[in-house]
């Protein structure tokens, strides 16, 4: 994942990836306090006269941290980094923010829900793929008992309480939209189960899907 905004390069070294998103993205969006979003899932719109930088966020499936010419471990290229030539990614990293310490779940839905909500998987409780309404996607096992999880995914706070096994949130794109941004989603969403509002990126604050 590459996160870009601003006009100068900033290297972030922090174990809490989501705290970094709160601190830098939401501060630039003019939203405060950050703890309100993280703790309750609701944020009030705050106006600001400061200029707003463009924000581009990439979530890339199955891309290793050494699969580009941009070093993500530290500022030095590894031997694997040197195998690749990705000058556009180098430029994006130079102009934006490069996270050098982060955590992502092993499958896509929990990570996507974390990016939208600012919560880790233990908080939003989406720990596997979301798919059909009210249906788990767990593999069956006679040995291991699997914990209950939110298989209906994340949902916009406008439908809070309507769906079982779901977490209602004010999504990051909605916060940005409320503060003057035009928001675009491209590609896979996989936030909520099919036939729920959370399955449609437009309900999460994206102007264009």
Question: What are the residue ranges of the model-derived segments?
Answer:
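Bacterial Sec-dependent N-terminal signal peptides
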Residues: 1-50
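Formylglycine-dependent sulfatase
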Residues: 21-23, 39-209
């Amino acid at each position: 994942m590459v996160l870009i905004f601003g006009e100068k390069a900033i290297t972030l070294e922090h174990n809490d990836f989501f705290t970094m998103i709160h601190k830098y993205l939401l501060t630039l969006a003019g939203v405060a306090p950050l703890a309100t979003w993280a703790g309750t899932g609701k944020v009030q719109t705050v106006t600001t006269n400061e200029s707003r930088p463009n924000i581009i966020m990439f979530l890339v499936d199955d891309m290793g941290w050494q699969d580009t010419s941009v070093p993500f471990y530290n500022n030095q290229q590894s031997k694997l980094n040197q195998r690749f030539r990705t000058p556009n990614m180098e430029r994006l990293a130079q102009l934006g923010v490069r996270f050098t310490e982060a955590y992502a779940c092993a499958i896509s839905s929990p990570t996507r829900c974390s990016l939208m909500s600012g919560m880790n998987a233990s908080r939003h409780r989406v720990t596997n793929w979301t798919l059909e309404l009210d249906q788990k996607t767990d593999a069956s096992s006679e040995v291991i008992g699997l914990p209950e999880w939110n298989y209906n995914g994340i949902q916009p706070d406008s439908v809070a309480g309507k769906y079982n096994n779901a977490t209602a949130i004010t999504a990051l794109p909605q916060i940005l939209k409320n503060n003057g941004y035009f928001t675009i989603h491209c590609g896979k969403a996989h936030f909520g189960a099919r036939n729920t509002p959370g399955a449609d990126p437009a309900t999460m604050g994206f102007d264009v899907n």
